[in-house]
Amino acid sequence: VFAGFRGLLDKQVPIERQQQALVRLKKYTGQAEGYEPLTELAKLRLTERSEIPGLIKPFAGEVQQDLERSPIMIEGLQGVFEATELEGYQEDLDLLKVQLTAYNSWVEETILPNTRYSAALPRELYELQLKNYGVDDSPEALIRTGQVGFMNIRNEMMALAPLVAQQKSYDTSDYREVIKRLKTEQVHGDELMASYRETMRELDFIIGREGLVSLPDEPARVRMATAAETAQQPAAHIDIPRLVCNTGEFPEFIVPKI
């Protein structure tokens, strides 16, 4: 729900298209004629599926994580709407927030006690998920590839660690200790944004100098994520605009709020 509204109400989306968020709100809350509240439909669907014998139950860790992040994203809906020029959304938005909060309580009381505590999937489902991502190798082949890749990266870290230790004046060159100490020197807030922008300017210069690819006329866009966006995706990523009917919307790099 949060991701859908955030995409629709992006500042690059024309106001005429953003108006559809008001229609969507009424449909989600069941206020539109012929529609039931989205949360009630979700309850019915989950209840229906849980009664099927032999069906794999959801993983407890995933459900718990969703329950912890949901309140942040529910509150984040307010900021998404407030950042637009839309009017007349508050009553329906308040209702949606109440419905989503009640739904979370229902999940905690009804679904969470009936979850599985092992994240492992049956082999068939695991292979199916791999194929959905275009991976045809067997799990055993992937394990071998991963082990070789890990050893290669470890060897590179062992070679680089002494150089980093010398530059940072560390009293150890063990790559594990070097990584631990680097993690204590994280950059936060405005300093992080400044670092990202400076690095992107350097990358743009190198790409242009070497003629690697064509670049847009304007600099790359980067911004700090909101608390709700960070809860949804707590890692740096690129927000790709729609490919169909794009009216000049640009991709934007999103930096998590840490």
Regions from the language model: what does each represent?
Residues V1-I258:
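N-terminal maturation segment of proteins
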